[in-house]
Amino acid sequence: MSNILVKKFGGTSLQNIDCINQVAKIIKQDVSNNYKVVVIVSAMGKFTDNIISQIKQISDVTSYHELSEYDLIISSGEQISCGMLSLALQKTGIKAQSWLGWQLPIVTTDDHAKARIMDINTSALKNFLVNNDVAIIAGFQGMHKENRVTTLGRGGSDTSAVAIAAALGIDLCYIYTDIDGIYTSDPNIIPKARKLDYIAYDEMIEMASLGAKVLQVRSVELAMKYQIKLHILSTFNPTKGTILCKKGEINMESQLITGITYNSNTASITLKKVKASFGITTLFSIIAENNINVDMIIQNMDNNANDITFTIPEEDLPITETLLIKIKDEIMYEELIINPDVVKVSIIGVGMISHPGIAYKMFHTLTSNNITILAVTTSEIKISVLVPRKDGQLATKYLHSSFELDAESNLHTTS
């Protein structure tokens, strides 16, 4: 079946009845153009955030069984979106039906709240589309081998959409949101930020992992693996958006820096005077076993004792702190310092590979504006710095200006 479109609509695109009707209008036009449409939906508006805040009033949710119930609860938002959109489409005469993760099924690992997709069975979906128009699938969720509901982590509906496209053999996935593409920085922080017409997978992976909120990083990794183009569009503003594709389809020669990201979802942890190297090995082994992502790592050695500083997502701070207190005697440190008052600011661009002096320009821009650099990490296409939270937005603005990202000539174009 070659006439299938895969489209994902985020929470802001579904936040109220007017928005749902607008989404239904977009889908109805596709059906009028003789397409079958597979739609992946997020929860309406702030539903998931609101339900999480209520969960926290009941439980800290740290054990496996608590996380299982947590997934059951927070996956309910997508179920509501599915049903509401299906009703809106049926009202207009469209043959639509909602599907939950277990009904396909979408099979995942049993890592509750951070599950990974193992397999998607599309047989029932394909059979349904033979005589029907639209399948609406709940994003963000699946089920593991014990038939319990799992969720894919925040933003997981993006990953659901790309995975479903891959399972169907579709090489283009449309991602609808409330903004009209990928920008050089967050327009809420940088009013002069420019929209990119095209961006390469590896740049977008860095931007997503470093704080850009348009796409979940796992969805970009999956798109790159299966060579699925992602077209980022606004539900409410009919512009051409941004296309995410491989480097060979973009004229990269003129590019230096593609974007600046600002990530406030970070916290730093320092362990003072870790006594031996095996303590460090044990530390990061235990953190990995608990599926906690460590980013920046800084080690200072003095007389066979180490000070270790590392950063983690802010939401992982409670469980990480609990773990570190529990294993204090095992890894032998003297003091634990928690600092949530930091942000990570990063510059990203494939052009920096062949241009010396980028790091100097970044550091000089920050220090000349009295912004303290607490930590640095680099890769071929990005440099990240940790700065005090109070300086994060200023740092982003200074760097965006310094690298002239609001200049028309810096936008990605087709080759």
Regions flagged by a language model, labelled:
Residues 1-220, 311, 387-388, 407, ...:
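Nucleotide/pyrophosphate-binding catalytic subdomain
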Residues 223:
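Acidic-aromatic/histidine active-site loop/patch
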Residues 243-415:
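A conserved regulatory-domain signal marking ACT and ACT-like small-molecule sensing domains
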